[in-house]
Structure formats: structure tokens, C-alpha cells
Regions:
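Helical transmembrane-bundle signal
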Residues: 44-54, 74-84, 122-126, 152-162
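Loop-to-helix transition at the N-terminal end of transmembrane alpha-helices
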Residues: 61-77
Length: 195
């Protein structure tokens, strides 16, 4: 009876430890991503405000197109930051299993990695527009090109830093899950024995 009681107590304590740790990992992921969305939303608001003021007041056609494109990018970045931030706040109340925690972590890492590749494409597109705009003396292509270069550069830096932060969180999570292979899904308790 003592052995059975000891095993049950160990399972319960292990489960509580694992759940608190999983909650901590989820909070770290949500906090990291939320902070990133605040930065992205702030960048978007800055571009919206400066673009809305400078676009109609620019005397140079190239500058007008630059600020017009920045205003559009600002709206997209602000909207993305705001909607993602709101979605993350709903996740704070959710109870994640170990499998769900790992899935969410992998998903956010993949999002920032793919965005990084897209940012390189934005920079290439902006550079192309600027070069072609210079050779054709096209203010619209030069203005749009410079804006896309600026936005792509910022987003590459942003997504790169976010990927690095999230990848670090993911590495800690994967290490934790390898060391503590006790699982609980609300109905069943499982122990994995490595042989």
C-alpha cells in the first residue's frame, strides 16, 4: 500500500510540476510574441502618422510615393500587430497540454522564419523598383522602391530577432519535454521510460 501511495503521490507531484512548467513556457511564448506585436504595431502607427502627414504635404513626387507606400505598410503592420496581440491575450486563459504547447511553439517559430524569407523578397523587390526607377526616371518606382526597401529592412530585423527569441524558447521547451516525459491529457496519465 505504501508503494502504491508513493507512486500516486509522485505522479500527482510530477503532473503539477509539469503543468506549472508548461504554463510558464506558454506565458513566455505569449509574452515574447505580445511584446513583438507591440513593437510591430508601434512601427505601423509611426508609419501611418508620418505617412498621413507627409504624403499630402510632399513637394517631390518621389517623396509623395514614398510616404504613400509607407502609409499603406503602416496600416498593414498596425493591423497585424493589433489583431495578433488581441488573439494572444485570449490564449492567456487557455490551458495547453504538452502536445499543444509544442505545436504552438513550432507554429510561431515557423511563422517568423517564413516571414524572414518574405522580408528578403521585399528587400529584393524594393531594390529592383529603385534601380529601375532611377534608370527610367520614374518617381513612382523610386518612391515605392525606397519605401519597400525600408519596410523590408525593418521587417527582416524584426522577424530575425523574433525568430531568435522564439527559437530559444522552443529549445528550452524541447529540452524540458525530453527530461520530463510524463504526460497528462485530463483523463490519462502516461510515463515514458527510455531504454
Amino acid at each position: 500500500m505504501k508503494k502504491l501511495l508513493t507512486i500516486v503521490l509522485m505522479l500527482v507531484c510530477s503532473h503539477v510540476f509539469a503543468q506549472d512548467s508548461l504554463k510558464s513556457f506558454n506565458n513566455t511564448r505569449i509574452n515574447t510574441t505580445s511584446s513583438g506585436m507591440e513593437i510591430l504595431g508601434g512601427w505601423g502607427a509611426l508609419n501611418l502618422a508620418t505617412g498621413a502627414i507627409a504624403w499630402p504635404n510632399s513637394t517631390s513626387p518621389e517623396a509623395r510615393y514614398f510616404f504613400k507606400m509607407n502609409t499603406i505598410w503602416g496600416a498593414v503592420n498596425f493591423g497585424t500587430g493589433l489583431l495578433t496581440y488581441a488573439s494572444l491575450q485570449k490564449q492567456r486563459k487557455k490551458h495547453f497540454t504538452a502536445a499543444e504547447t509544442l505545436k504552438e511553439q513550432q507554429r510561431i517559430e515557423k511563422i517568423f522564419l517564413i516571414n524572414g524569407y518574405l522580408d528578403v523578397a521585399y528587400i529584393g523587390t524594393g531594390l529592383y523598383l529603385k534601380i529601375v526607377g532611377d534608370s527610367r526616371h520614374s518617381p513612382i518606382m523610386k518612391g515605392y522602391g525606397e519605401s519597400v526597401l525600408l519596410q523590408g529592412g525593418f521587417l527582416l530585423l524584426f522577424d530575425g530577432l523574433m525568430y531568435k527569441a522564439e527559437k530559444g524558447n522552443g529549445t528550452k521547451l524541447r529540452t524540458f519535454l525530453e527530461k520530463h516525459p510524463i504526460t497528462f491529457d485530463g483523463r490519462r496519465v502516461g510515463i515514458v521510460f527510455n531504454m
